[in-house]
UniProtKB/Swiss-Prot annotation:
This is Transketolase-like protein 1. Belongs to the transketolase family. It comes from Bos taurus. The gene is TKTL1. It catalyses: D-sedoheptulose 7-phosphate + D-glyceraldehyde 3-phosphate = aldehydo-D-ribose 5-phosphate + D-xylulose 5-phosphate. Thiamine diphosphate binds at S49, G94, W95, L96, V127, N156, K218, H232, E340, F366, Q402.
Amino acid sequence: MADAEASATMADEAKPDSKTLQILRDMANRLRIHSIRATCASSSGHPISCSSAAEIMSVLFFHVMRYKQADPKNPDNDRFILSKRLSFVDVATGWLGQGLGAACGMAYTGKYFDKASYRVFCLVGDVESWEGSVWEALAFASHYSLDNLVAIFDVNRLTHSTTLPLEHSIDVYQKRCEAFGWNTLVVDGRDVEALCQVFWQAAQMKNKPTAVVAKTFKGRGIPSVEDAENWHGKPMPKERADAIIKLIESQIETNKSLEPKAPIEDSPQINISVIEMTSPPDYEISDVIATRKACGLALAKLGHANDRVIVLDGDTKNSTFSDIFKREHPERFIECFIAEQNMVSVALGCVTRGRTVAFACTFAAFLTRAFDQIRMGGISQTNINLIGSHCGVSIGEDGPSQMALEDLAMFRAIPNCTIFYPSDAISTEHAVFLAANIKGMCYIRTSRPETAIIYTPQESFEIGQAKVIRQSVNDKITVVGAGITLHEALAAADDLSKQGISLRVIDLFTVKPLDAATIISNAKATGGQIITVEDHYPEGGIGEAVSAAVSMEPDIVVHHLAVSGIPRSGKPSDLLDMFGISSKHIIWAVERILMK
């Protein structure tokens, strides 16, 4: 009884006074007016959806959250996730269903890496709660006890074109969130006093994230529009806007505003500006090792170089070899399970405000499921690093469902994305360290088969710089490869040399940016003939990248070897041969060109 009374007393003390409550109501109405004016001026936008959440936003920003208005990127500020990347909002989530995953990454970073007081708030629409990625995020947050995370479900029942099946069945939303292990609070989203109460309750919860299920109405406060269908995404007609604004203004009782609470300044000072390779790669020329394993070893080494390096994996760590990082840095490894969309979103959240250097690992084929998150990461100008293993038909017996043959096309389409395609363990280690230090998204494509060491430990690598690894004055054709096909090109060069035919062989190292200058100069030195060979479909891969790079050179011809057709299960060597990218097929291509 005493505990209950104490709890009630605490709740009473947390209540704002009547003047503060009125200011919060007035600020909500000002937000409605701003949304109407802004969308009318731009002839685009969502004033109706904004109106449903106005009280939620007013209470959050002017009563609950702690932040410095003049310093929106301050690491101690509370975080808020909505739909656009503004100065205060760290990630773009305009395509629905992604915000909560990013919020999970921010909350995980705050709780486990920063060990700081800042909290994370994410506004989730009832419409987007139909996206599976939302439920991946709900499961993740519960599993990791993210009690510094609050998700606010804006349940206004209306969709873009109709009504949701659940409409205002608030109890169903409540039960679903509770089933996923969340502390769930139901509230009238129009009642600022009730909102203040539930957000206070959320702050008291330990070891569980909190879901606030708020019953709201689209178009709240707008006559003939509130809770009406077919208004989504439409500005108010300009001939009605002035009258609506005057009506809302008549409900405002004060000109006062509220200042947000100052943040608690307890985030650690960190430095991720330059992470140096502490020693050269430790490999011998006689070593044989898969680039996927070399990548895992490189991540562990990188983790020793900087304690803000983290690794995420989607339950493939014993195949991607990210488990090596986990063994050496267990407190900085995040298991995301089979939920690739959420894994990428969590990584996006972890790297915001420069708090971590994150690498997310899985099979390259599985990253295609997260293309939506990757695309929005590009729009957010994120610094995440993605590692895709088991690329191409060279993975062998696992079959076509596991073979990434579209991933280069996918990542080449992302603005400012750097694509590494290392061909041996030494270049892989350099790719990892380079990715850790460059701004923008990075993708590292690794292979399953064990391959020989090509480079010496002293070799240096740069982004956008290809390597000419076989050349002579007698070279007839330039062969461009990367990863497994580079080794096939070297084997073809060895066999052809016995016939007195010399090939020039180029290792791209980075597919994007492409070293066009090196490719063009070497092609001109070998009669203008280029053969590209890749473990990827023809569309969007190395061949098309090289063709685009030399397209303005009239005397250069590109011959393209790639995987044509749906692959099958088999031995790696058999599949390379079956799909026309083995050393034998390179030799045949050379012979055909020279016969002409």
